[in-house]
């Protein structure tokens, strides 16, 4: 997909003029088609396919250059969230914003509603949100359908696993803080909330009978493992078409560190959804429980400091797509593939605030192995998780 005459080891700067980007130059997917802009973007095409032997087709995508405008980054939406203190976005509301005119088979609502407030649906006449853009998406789907290696590894910069939460299950003392009717989303910036285009990709995988799909990503500054599915119940049946992983950061701050500083203890009844102290007074990332098992689980841990009691309070319907979440994890991940098995290993180090002693990188917090056997078309992938060493805490 490189421009004519380009090489992978040379990136000559294109000759472009500094021209204004006019509103009339944007196409339906949000790409500005001004010639100088296109020349700049196309001078270094990131998306490409690489092959390793019989077992790995590595497909890399560019999630930045062709992305459409964030549908939630509009002043029109602000009145819905005035005074909101939870910060979650209703799952259904985001689906309406994401799909635009394509919502509900081409029948978007006239109003966007959150609790007793509503605004005009400014997305009703606009195209669905896109991460890849039309040209790259066509290339990606074609390569996915035609991939012949045992494992099709999709390498990209943004995770595909939903960051869903269940604020509708908050206890009575806190239930008034949630104005939505059902599930919410903790974040809405990556593939985890790119419902429409993600569904298009995963439906193509299913319809073509593609097996061995593995999504590997970063960006969240945390470790995640689970199943690649286009949607979660009750919006749709849970039908995973692959497995998905997010690797942690070596040094960049994650949400666990942030919450230790910003979630103050005084007059903060929802603090336990993010951070709580264990029996020894050490902070623990209960945000993992909120995402993996639900708000009741996180608040139970805050109250009792007991992991088993927290798990007993879990919401089993919240996150069928997740098997592991550690928003306090630093380290790296490895992926190994052979004729019948894919293994992803998370290697987590202690929080990197001081240099580790010795030349071996120092001690580990944990190592976790995620093993997946190759599945047949029409079957569901199955993941087996093993803690090889250390303590994964509230991550499972």
Residues of each region from the PLM?
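Long, structured stretches of catalytic cores involved in phosphate-ester chemistry, encompassing
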Residues: 1-396
């Amino acid at each position: 997909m490189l421009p004519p005459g380009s090489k992978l080891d040379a990136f000559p700067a294109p000759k472009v003029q500094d021209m204004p980007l006019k509103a009339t130059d944007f196409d339906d997917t949000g790409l500005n088609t001004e010639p100088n802009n296109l020349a700049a973007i196309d001078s270094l095409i990131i998306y490409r396919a690489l092959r390793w032997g019989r077992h790995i087709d590595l497909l890399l995508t560019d999630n930045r250059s062709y992305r459409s405008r964030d549908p939630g980054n509009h002043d029109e939406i602000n009145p819905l969230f005035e005074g909101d203190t939870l910060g979650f976005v209703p799952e259904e509301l985001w689906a309406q914003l994401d799909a635009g005119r394509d919502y509900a088979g081409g029948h978007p609502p006239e109003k966007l509603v959150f609790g007793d407030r509503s605004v005009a649906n400014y997305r009703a006449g606009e195209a669905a949100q896109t991460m890849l853009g039309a040209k790259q998406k066509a290339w990606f789907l074609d390569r996915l359908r035609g991939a012949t290696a045992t494992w099709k590894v999709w390498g990209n910069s943004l995770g595909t696993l939903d960051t869903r939460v269940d604020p509708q299950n908050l206890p009575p003392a806190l239930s008034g803080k949630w104005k939505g009717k059902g599930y919410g989303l903790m974040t809405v910036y990556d593939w985890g909330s790119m419902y429409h285009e993600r569904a298009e990709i995963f439906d193509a995988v299913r319809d073509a009978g593609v097996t061995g799909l593995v999504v590997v990503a970063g960006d969240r500054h945390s470790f995640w493992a689970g199943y690649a599915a286009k949607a979660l119940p009750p919006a749709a049946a849970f039908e995973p078409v692959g497995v998905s992983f997010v690797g942690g950061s070596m040094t960049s701050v994650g949400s666990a560190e942030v919450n230790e500083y910003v979630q103050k203890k005084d007059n903060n009844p929802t603090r336990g959804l993010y951070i709580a102290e264990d029996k020894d007074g050490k902070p623990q990332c209960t945000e993992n429980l909120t995402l993996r098992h639900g708000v009741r689980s996180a608040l139970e841990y805050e109250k009792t400091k007991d992991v088993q009691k927290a798990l007993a309070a879990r919401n089993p319907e919240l996150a069928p797509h997740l098997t592991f979440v550690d928003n306090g994890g630093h380290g790296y991940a490895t992926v190994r593939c052979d004729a019948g098995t894919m293994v992803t290993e998370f290697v987590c180090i202690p929080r990197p605030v001081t240099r580790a002693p010795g030349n071996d990188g120092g001690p580990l917090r944990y190592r976790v192995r995620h093993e997946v056997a190759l599945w047949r078309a029409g079957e569901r992938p199955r993941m087996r998780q093993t803690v090889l060493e250390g303590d994964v805490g509230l991550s499972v």
